[in-house]
Structures are given as C-alpha cells and as structure tokens.
Regions:
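Catalytic-pocket segment enriched in acidic/His residues
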Residues: 13-35, 46, 50-59, 119, ...
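Extended, compositionally biased flexible segments
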Residues: 13-115
C-alpha cells in the first residue's frame, strides 16, 4: 500500500499566516524524514488487569476512545514538567500505532494495511482531576488532554519490525519495574481497534492510536526517571522535572 492521504492538503501555492503553524512530528527509525502528527486517539480500559485495578468498567464492554491534542505529543528524551492542578500525576505505558493511510469503516481483516509503524508511548494522566470528572459526569480532558501528556518514542516502520501483536510491554521508575504485561493481553487488539475507531472517525495518515495500558499504573513526582519498553521497539526514556513557573 502507498501511504499518504487521498487528497493531499499541501498545495504548491503561496499562503500567508498570521503566525507560523506548529507541526508536531516524531522521528522515524532508519529514515531522516519525520512523521507529522495529525490526531491522537486513545483506547480506554483495554487490559483486563487494569480495569480490575481501577475498579471501573467491565472487560466485556465495547471499546471506547478519547483524544489528546497533537501538540501533547513529546518526542523521547525531552523532560516532562509536572503539570499544574494535580497532586496525583500518573503514568500509563502504551503501544502506539501510527496510521499511514486513510481508513473509513475498514474491516478487521484489512485494518493492518493502513498501519505505518509502531512506537512506545505513555498516557500521562492527572488522575485526581480525571476522577473528579467521573464523579460529576463532566468531560475528562482536564485529566488526560494537557500539555506534554503524550510522550512518544521513535516510530518503527512495519517494513522493519512487522506488526506488534504480541510481546512484552513494561515501565520502570528509577530502575524499579512498575508495569509489565504482554500485548496479547489486550481486550481489543490492534486490527480490532482500528476497525472500531474507523466506524466513527475518518482515520488519516498522521494519526496516532494509543492502545491502552496494563496493570500497575501509579504516581510520579519531580526527579523520577521513566523507561518504557515494548519488545522489538526502541525504548522511551524521560525524566519528570518541577512545575513550570
């Protein structure tokens, strides 16, 4: 499959903007080009053990999705500032799927055809704010969709690593392992996620999908060093620093 959108939004015309538009992009392993991020979709409650530790939802529930802004994505190696308005800042290790072609209501059988590659990511969460939103029934972007809330490693093209349907996923804080699972423990696997998501959204090249986290999520504080790994992919490492003034 040739990756790219059916209708290229980039035209060879002179455009003037009131300010330079910011493009969030991630490095690609083995390539000097970068992967421009269009949208970030996240799958909620996709590992049984995580559902049980959070005491929310049911493993028989259909998949549900939320989003983070594209500029919440931070490339590996960049320090993450402890965010404001929280006393319970938590990590969630995730496999990230990078979409390379358009998909609308695609079948499970064809879903992997639109995958450009895979990366390691973390869904950073203001857990106390998220729980407040659950209690009030208000939207929970404040707990999930804030600045620097989606650290992501370099993208490995499928041509180099194949499809990541099984393999260990883990996260350590200051050298102590806090999360460990296997991608085959997902309730909804990658092709099922893509097929379900494409029923509600027109997926396009540049989209990222964070596929859920295994059990073991927990708090982090300034000074902590996180290393996140998915078998066969480049690990993601970053440190938590003090709140921005």
């Amino acid at each position: 499959m040739s990756f790219g959108t059916r209708h290229d939004p980039v035209r060879q015309v002179a455009l003037m903007f009131v300010f330079d538009p910011r493009i969030t992009a991630l490095p690609i392993v083995g390539c000097e080009d970068r992967f421009p991020v269009r949208r970030v979709y996240c799958v909620g409650r996709n590992y049984v053990a995580h559902i049980r530790e959070m005491k929310e939802g049911d493993e028989r529930d259909p998949p549900f999705f939320f989003q983070k802004p594209a500029d919440a994505v931070v490339a590996g190696g960049v320090d993450i500032s402890y965010p404001p308005q929280t006393d319970d800042f938590q990590f969630e290790a995730e496999l990230v799927v990078a979409i390379g072609a358009e998909a609308v209501d695609i079948s499970v059988e064809r879903a992997l055809d639109v995958v450009f590659g895979y990366a390691v990511g973390v869904d950073l969460t203001r857990r106390d704010r998220q729980r407040e939103s659950f209690k009030t029934g208000l939207p929970w972007e404040v707990g999930k969709a804030f600045d620097q809330s989606a650290p992501c490693g370099a993208i490995h093209p499928v041509a180099g690593v194949g499809h990541r349907l099984t393999g260990a996923i883990s996260l350590s804080v200051n050298g102590v392992e806090r999360q460990r699972g296997d991608l085959n423990q997902m309730i909804w696997n990658t092709p099922e996620i893509i097929a379900n998501l494409s029923k509600s959204y027109r997926l396009q090249a540049g989209d990222l999908i964070m596929t859920g986290t295994p059990a073991g999520v927990g708090p982090i504080v300034p000074g902590d060093r996180l290393i996140v790994s998915v078998e066969g992919l480049t690990p993601l490492a970053f440190s938590i620093v003090g709140k921005e003034s």
